[in-house]
């Protein structure tokens, strides 16, 4: 298995006293960014400071490079939230995932609280849209056209589909081979040591780039629409080979 490495976003900031005591630091930082150095020096040379003595010209150029290197465009941000994000967060990318993640040292510097609030909003919108679609599909599958679903029944069915319980997880795993070392997710086939880990994976899978919760919601929708049909198929089938799992209806 490959080794994981954490990449730090930025190094520690340099104080103003250190810059005044060691001016060569800024020149070394400026040489590492040739575009900034090239654009900063000619602008200062073309300014009225060119008529000053050489010792004052060096001070002016030094101040111009300092202002250019510490500008907000060249850093991650000078706000208080940006400083916390730079100091406490790192970038982590697993070998099996095409996505990169922010790993923070504490909850206060979590990127979702500062620069990425749309992640939680999109997750909530996605969950609400899925629950509404499931409720509408259940209502539209009624045998008679006169029977309409009221608002209360729709809300109850929506709440039932949103909550994935331990009983639902165990019921979905009946059509899979028995696992002795843990619990297997019926959607992505990943193994987890305990049932609580599997429940948290299903609940927070959206942040990993996929959502196994959708799979379990569709299973619950099928079970709620025709529970007697699943029970009749199970009793009529004499062996497991003749029994069709509800997962085949989702494909």
Curated annotation (Swiss-Prot):
InterPro entries tied to this protein? Spt46-like
Q: Nucleus: present as a keyword of the record? A: yes
Where in the cell is the protein located?
Answer: Nucleus membrane
Coiled coil ranges (UniProt) are none
Q: Which GO terms describe its cellular component?
A: nuclear membrane
Keywords of the record, alphabetical order, are: Differentiation, Membrane, Nucleus, Spermatogenesis
**GO:BP terms for this protein?**
cell differentiation; fusion of sperm to egg plasma membrane involved in single fertilization; spermatogenesis
Matches recorded under Pfam families: Spt46
Role noted for this protein:
Plays a role in spermiogenesis and fertilization.
- Name of this chain's protein: Spermatogenesis-associated protein 46
User: Could you tell me which species this protein originates from?
Assistant: Macaca fascicularis
């Amino acid at each position: 298995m490959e080794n994981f490495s954490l990449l730090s976003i930025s190094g520690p900031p340099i104080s103003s006293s250190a810059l005044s005591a060691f001016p060569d630091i800024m020149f070394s930082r400026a040489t590492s960014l040739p575009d900034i150095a090239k654009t900063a020096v000619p602008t200062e040379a073309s300014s009225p400071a060119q008529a000053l003595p050489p010792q004052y010209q060096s001070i002016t150029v030094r101040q111009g490079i300092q202002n250019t290197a510490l500008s907000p465009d060249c850093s991650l941000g000078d706000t208080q939230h940006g400083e916390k994000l730079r100091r406490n967060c790192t970038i982590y990318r697993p070998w099996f995932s095409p996505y990169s993640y922010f790993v923070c040292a504490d909850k206060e510097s979590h990127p979702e609280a500062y620069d990425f609030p749309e992640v939680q909003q999109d997750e909530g919108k996605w969950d609400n849209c899925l629950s509404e679609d499931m409720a509408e599909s259940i209502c539209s599958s009624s045998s008679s056209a006169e029977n309409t679903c009221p608002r209360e029944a729709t809300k109850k069915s929506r709440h039932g589909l949103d909550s994935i319980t331990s009983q639902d997880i165990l019921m979905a795993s009946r059509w899979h081979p028995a696992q002795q070392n843990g619990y297997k997710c019926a959607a992505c086939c990943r193994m987890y040591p305990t049932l609580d880990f599997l429940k948290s994976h299903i609940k927070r899978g959206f942040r990993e780039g996929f959502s196994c919760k959708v799979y379990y919601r569709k299973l619950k929708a099928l079970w709620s629409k025709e529970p007697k049909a699943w029970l009749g198929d199970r009793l009529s089938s004499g062996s497991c080979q003749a029994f069709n799992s509800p997962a085949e209806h989702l494909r």
